[in-house]
Amino acid sequence: MVDEDFAWRLARELVRIDSSDPGAFEDEIERHIKGLIESQVAGLGRPALDAVRIEELEVLPGRRNLMVTVPGLSDEPRLVYICHMDTVTLGDGWDADIPPLGAIVRNDKLYGRGACDMKGGLACAIAALVHTLERVAAEGELPRRGFSLICSVDEEDFMRGSEAAIDAGWVGSREWVLDTEPTDGQIQVAHKGRTWFEIEMAGVTAHASQPWKGADAVAAMAEAVCSLRRAFAALPAHDELGPSTITFGQIEGGYRPYVVPD
């Protein structure tokens, strides 16, 4: 059985490490996880010790993916856990009783930045890896099916860590992949993709008393927003994933209330 107490302790350790994105990013937490796993691997006897692979992949300066692989005795597809190490920014709303990096436990609930997304899931995946390594050490042989843990960077931004892992051949379509993102305990078999885009409108400035002499870039953007919302509403829904959605997360424009924005 996986050691639940170990998973709890590890989750608290991970929450206490700032890996906000943007912010501290993943350098410290990646080194912490790597050191923990290296100490576990060091306790294996040969030939298992020689078989286990620990690999790093620098995706961005100072931001490394980490993969640990326990090879299997058969050629069956590996089981691959993939988890991201970064969190969103620490943000506001915390206090002295529950600080963002406090890892406070109350009523069997862990509080802190990233406790849910996804250091709790990351700790569970590492605990599964450690359990596998302990089984290998106790039984003196590798498992029938290979096992890999991938800890990725940049999930909260452009997911360049996951893309780099795929491009490097760390994971492919043949493997069985489990992502321990929070889903309220519901097993999900797919999720929506995403596309980020920027739109820039160019207008012609004029005084607000004579707007017909200019071209209002903000008004043009409003038309574009409404048009895109109507277009998305008309798209067919997916049987598993539901309808496509669009969100306009940020709009900037204008100079002063008395000037037609360009």
Language model region names:
Residues 19, 85, 155, 182, ...:
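Active-site metal-binding loops of divalent metal-dependent hydrolases
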Residues 77-80, 108-109, 148, 175-178, ...:
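Structural motif
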Residues 163, 167-262:
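Midchain, well-structured core segments that form catalytic/ion-binding scaffolds
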Residues 16, 38, 42, 134-137, ...:
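Generic secondary-structure signature for well-ordered alpha-helical cores
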Residues 118-192, 196:
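Acidic/histidine-rich catalytic neighborhood of metal-dependent amide-processing enzymes
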